[in-house]
């Protein structure tokens, strides 16, 4: 059973930092908005640099504070965004099931993780916009096969129709919580939201 926090400053048992990465336009910001506020915007949100939201959930009798960072997919922001990989405890790699190129680039994003994140970071592959079945070009079996190749979990989601969004974030949080219990000396490295790295959003076109 999960529920949004009524008081963001309330006590919590675990603080977990998650990171959303993937090409521009795959719907990372929409996934974050759906999970954190249970809302959806039909406008495409271009993240400038990096942005974050917080949601506290109840998970297996513990209060888990999720600090979720949304990164820009554009190459010109890569230096800024890769700086946040090191502190991530979990990373969601997002592609658009209607965009073959975004799926092909997942291997590049995984290489970025291998170069900049900790070895123990939990990962999950997300095929977003699964509600657009008539435009789908990346079959579910291909997503599952790629995830299996890297030994990570896979889900198809729709931020627009709220399909598997909750499940994706909660599943990753559960895996991280288990790892923290199994390795009690591991402390989360949390990037504090002190400096605004251009987190303002520009709205352009449709996103799911």
Curated annotation (Swiss-Prot):
Superkingdom as given in the UniProt entry: Eukaryota
Stated name of the protein: Ras-related protein Rab-8A
Keyword Membrane in record: yes
General function of this protein: Protein transport. Probably involved in vesicular traffic.
Species, as recorded: Dictyostelium discoideum (Social amoeba)
Gene Ontology MF terms in the entry: GTP binding; GTPase activating protein binding; GTPase activity; protein-containing complex binding
UniProt keyword list: Cell membrane, GTP-binding, Lipoprotein, Membrane, Nucleotide-binding, Prenylation, Protein transport, Transport
GO BP annotation list: actin cytoskeleton organization; calcium-dependent cell-cell adhesion via plasma membrane cell adhesion molecules; contractile vacuole discharge; contractile vacuole organization; contractile vacuole tethering involved in discharge; exocytosis; hypotonic response; protein transport
Region (Disordered): 186-208
Positions of GTP binding: 22-29, 70-74, 128-131
UniProt-listed CDD domains: Rab8_Rab10_Rab13_like
Acyltransferase recorded as keyword: no
One GO CC term, this protein: plasma membrane
Membrane topology of the entry: Lipid-anchor
Cited Gene3D superfamilies: P-loop containing nucleotide triphosphate hydrolases (3.40.50.300)
Compositionally biased tracts (Polar residues): 186-201
